Amino acid sequence: GIIKLLSEMVEIKSISSDKNHRDDVDASAQFVQNLFAGLGLNTQVIKVAGGMPAVVAHTEIDPSKKTVLLYAHHDVQPVGDLSMWDTEPFNPVLKEGRLYGRGSGDNKAGVVVHYNVVKKLLEDLPVNIRIFVEGEEEIGSPTMSDFIEQNREALEADVIVIADSANVKIGVPTITTTLRGLVDGFIEVDQPMRPVHSGMGGGIVPDAFMVLSKIIASFHDDKGNLQ
């Protein structure tokens, strides 16, 4: 059943940030591939240069139907301080209807959700299905842009469903319609080519720190909204 399947996934120590667990991340990807291959989907494990293994899969594509991409990730965070755990992180335990173990929620549950939905609807799917289960989300998906660039066709879809969010509260099914994004970059501010005394610099002619602080302060309005 669902609990048994999720438990088997949780037992795999797919810690993407730990080089000592590279084999476990590979094993986790293989597990996910086998899952969807068992449903008859076309599946692949793909790893771009410097990246962790991701699984892509798809049903037979009917051009007359819309295509839905189901996203999740199979890697997990390190366990941290073991003294803070009441159970062994990779020995899943079912207590009062909840499964405890590293990745039981984030995000191996998401993989199992996608698997069971496809399994239930497979004989009469109203849409084309593509699957993307990455293996480096917990380290910031450093090769995501390269992966997308190299596998655009495998990820092409009209809608994306991400099984990696949270419920409003336990037991209440929840659909999240927006998620925070992430943008990084560099801001360079020129300053005098030689040191100046703090009592002499700044003021009418602002120094680099003043300019940079104003730029950063302009990112949000008084209510915290991005501008």
What would you call each of these model-derived segments?
Residues S7, Q33, V112-Y115, K119, ...:
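Predominant activation on well-ordered alpha-helical scaffold segments within soluble catalytic domains
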Residues E11, A37, E123, R152-E153, ...:
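Generic secondary-structure signature for well-ordered alpha-helical cores
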